[in-house]
């Protein structure tokens, strides 16, 4: 008897919108040396190969930090740090080149695998490395000569894009040459950040030891604006002690993610290299699994406050007059303001929606959904829906329902199904207006 998996079918179908959204998008992936040394690395390579087969344009930047520490210990060579950057003298540079070359070959070999009965079967991936990054020395700081430690001077974006257009994966390490023919040791996080910025990448992805950025309670923060990420980074830096005075891999990548987003990279993702399938879950599921640092926008999605009532009234009044929304008084809005989420642009409320929980039935109502006429050509309705879904999940609710007279098809497109009045919570059934005859739709499995 053949094995059948409805979960596989369901997951595959749910991933389809993300497959379409990510196709032909440029992604820079940062693989620190810790990720390469982890037992899960083979699975990470398999997932990167899968992204390549789905049409993503992939640049990989790898690091060498733990491998370098091990080699320095073996050779009993001391390579001190200054302001968090290793001073790379001639002997240290030779060791860095040795490790970087070895890891480049190892990663290339992994990506070249195409054995039957493996996830890489039939992949036939071309991996391209080269002098796409030109370096320059860091120079002298506070009387300390960084020697062969360097920074990115320029990047051959045209050359990289030609390789990506051919569906090749571009693989780059922390060692780059200069216009004088010298080699320099660069911070791999800086290389990845600069590549994402100068390639106008759609995403910068970093594999870290933690599953994203955690708040003070140890909970994963799903999304951060650069300003929020900066506050967290400053807090983490203050917690560093003399015994543990170096930035962690997560902190270094978070710093790069902030810079990338400020420079125009729409999204940077922090995920764990320890968890099997983290990359796929982050990119191809609604909730993701790690932390996203997203570009700040003139539009802000936030919880409504009492001062927003005037703006909400201005937004919903025309819809109430048309009979699309049930009329609400200012007094009612004042009582319910905590239930509202709004999208604000330059001080104007351009969209709103409210969430009314019914915890006994494990349900919540999405009500008073309105978008300003000038802003209905975007995805603001979807943004509000996603925010309310997340809130409902926080309340441990499993279903979201809506009553509508005009937007039946839009809600069905978002996964809602039409039901009869008996599916409503008992309190809502008693208030249902049979003359208005609103359509009832339910979204299950939040």
Curated annotation (Swiss-Prot):
Which PANTHER family does the record cross-reference, listed alphabetically? Answer: AMINO-ACID ACETYLTRANSFERASE, AMINO-ACID ACETYLTRANSFERASE NAGS1, CHLOROPLASTIC-RELATED
* Keyword Magnesium among UniProt keywords: no
The molecule here is called Amino-acid acetyltransferase
Checking Pfam families in the record gives: AA_kinase, Acetyltransf_1
UniProt xrefs under SUPFAM superfamilies: Acyl-CoA N-acyltransferases (Nat) (SSF55729), Carbamate kinase-like (SSF53633)
Where in the cell does this protein reside? Answer: Cytoplasm
Instruction: Name the InterPro entries on file.
Output: AceGlu_kinase-like_sf (IPR036393), Acyl_CoA_acyltransferase (IPR016181), Asp/Glu/Uridylate_kinase (IPR001048), GNAT_dom (IPR000182), NAGS_kin (IPR033719), NH2A_AcTrfase (IPR010167)
**Similarity annotation:** Belongs to the acetyltransferase family. ArgA subfamily.
**E.C. no:** 2.3.1.1
């Amino acid at each position: 008897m053949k094995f059948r998996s409805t979960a596989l079918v369901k997951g595959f179908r749910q991933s389809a919108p993300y497959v379409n959204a990510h196709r032909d998008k440029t992604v820079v992936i940062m693989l620190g040396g810790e990720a390469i040394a982890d037992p899960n690395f083979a699975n990470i390579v398999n997932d990167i190969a899968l992204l390549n087969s789905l049409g993503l344009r992939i640049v990989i930047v790898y690091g060498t930090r733990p491998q370098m520490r091990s080699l320095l210990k073996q050779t009993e060579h001391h390579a001190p740090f200054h302001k968090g950057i290793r001073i790379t003298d001639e002997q240290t540079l030779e060791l860095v080149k040795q490790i970087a070359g070895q890891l480049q070959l190892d990663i290339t070999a992994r990506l070249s695998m195409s054995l039957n009965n493996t996830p890489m079967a039939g992949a036939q991936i071309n991996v391209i490395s080269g002098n796409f990054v030109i370096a320059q020395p860091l120079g002298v700081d506070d009387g300390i000569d960084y020697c062969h430690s360097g920074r990115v001077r320029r990047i051959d974006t045209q050359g990289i894009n030609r390789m990506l257009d051919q569906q090749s994966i571009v693989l780059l390490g922390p060692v780059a040459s200069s216009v004088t023919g010298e080699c320099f040791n660069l911070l791999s996080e800086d290389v990845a950040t600069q590549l994402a910025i100068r390639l106008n990448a759609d995403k910068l992805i970093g594999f870290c030891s933690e599953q994203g950025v955690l708040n003070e309670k140890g909970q994963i923060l799903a999304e951060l604006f650069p300003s929020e990420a900066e506050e967290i980074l400053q807090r983490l830096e203050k917690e560093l002690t003399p015994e543990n005075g170096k930035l962690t891999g997560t902190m270094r990548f978070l710093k790069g993610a902030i810079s990338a987003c400020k420079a125009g990279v729409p999204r940077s993702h922090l995920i764990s290299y320890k968890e099997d399938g983290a990359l796929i879950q982050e990119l191809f599921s609604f909730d993701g699994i790690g932390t996203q640092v997203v570009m700040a926008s003139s539009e802000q999605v936030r919880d409504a406050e009492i001062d927003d009532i005037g703006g909400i009234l201005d937004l919903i009044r025309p819809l109430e007059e048309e009979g699309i929304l049930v009329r609400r008084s200012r007094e009612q809005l004042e009582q319910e303001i905590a239930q509202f989420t709004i999208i604000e642009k330059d001080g104007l409320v351009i969209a709103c929606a409210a969430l009314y929980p019914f915890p006994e039935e494990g349900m919540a109502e999405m009500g008073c959904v309105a978008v300003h006429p000038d802003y209905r050509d975007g995805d603001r309705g979807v943004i509000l829906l996603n925010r309310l879904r997340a809130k409902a999940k926080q309340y441990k609710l499993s279903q979201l329902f809506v009553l509508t007279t005009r937007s039946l098809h839009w809600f069905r497109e978002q996964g809602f199904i039409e039901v009869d009045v008996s599916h409503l919570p008992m309190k809502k059934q008693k208030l249902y207006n049979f003359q208005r005859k609103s359509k009832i739709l339910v979204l299950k499995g939040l």
